[in-house]
Amino acid sequence: MGQKVHPTGFRLGILKSWDSRWFATKDYAKLVHEDRKIRDYIKARLYHAGIAKVEIERAANKVKIRIFTARPGIVIGKKGAEIETLRRDLERKFKREILIDIQEVRRPELDATLVGENISLQLVRRVAFRRAMKRAVSAALKFGAKGVRVASAGRLGGAEMARREWYREGRVPLHTLRADIDYGTAIARTTYGAIGVKVWIFKGEVLP
């Protein structure tokens, strides 16, 4: 059975960069765990803001967090009130000086993580999984994607036995290193159980 390597990890240092950028000697594991906790906290708190990615940079006791969001207005809040509250809460929780930078995701239809979350939201609302997948794929292609592949696994449509279904349009060359492929996952927690959603979006080849 063919296994898929993680498309982002496969291209690290070639087309993709790391989401955590810092250097550590003895506290490495502790800081990796802290990064994970920061990401989980931000994604849970700003769930409705469409968080695509959270990048973290560290220097001494300072942590710079860059949040990529489809709805910056929700994150920033009125006169920056929401972002200031978030910064203070993070400082209190992690005992470090926190700087937050907000970046807008201009085309959320081409962000694999946001597409996956959109599909999972539709599955929770009991939209037919094939319709949800096809709608997301056609929207991404309309906004300029060269190819899209979506896979869903679990008790699809409330079926007794779990299964995996996928849908693809265009080409998604997973083994071509110069191919710019965005990959994202999401989990739809339905009344029948969890359904995993994976999305691959091919945006074109980046020539050296």
From Swiss-Prot:
Q: InterPro entries of this UniProt entry?
A: KH_dom (IPR004087), KH_dom-like_a/b (IPR015946), KH_dom_type_2 (IPR004044), KH_sf_prok-type (IPR009019), Ribosomal_S3_C_sf (IPR036419), Ribosomal_uS3_bac-typ (IPR005704), Ribosomal_uS3_C (IPR001351), Ribosomal_uS3_CS (IPR018280)
Q: KH type-2 domain location, by residue?
A: 38-106
**Superkingdom classification of source:** Bacteria
Cross-referenced Pfam families, in alphabetical order? Answer: KH_2, Ribosomal_S3_C
Q: Which SMART domains match?
A: KH (SM00322)
An example Gene Ontology cellular component term from the record? cytosolic small ribosomal subunit
Q: Which GO terms describe its molecular function?
A: mRNA binding; rRNA binding; structural constituent of ribosome
Q: Please give the CDD domains that the UniProt record associates with this protein.
A: KH-II_30S_S3
Q: Which Gene3D superfamilies does this one have?
A: 3.30.300.20, Ribosomal protein S3, C-terminal domain (3.30.1140.32)
Alphabetical UniProt keywords? Ribonucleoprotein, Ribosomal protein, RNA-binding, rRNA-binding
Functional note: Binds the lower part of the 30S subunit head. Binds mRNA in the 70S ribosome, positioning it for translation.
- Which family is annotated? Belongs to the universal ribosomal protein uS3 family.
The protein here is known as Small ribosomal subunit protein uS3
Classification from the root reads: Bacteria, Pseudomonadati, Thermodesulfobacteriota, Syntrophobacteria, Syntrophobacterales
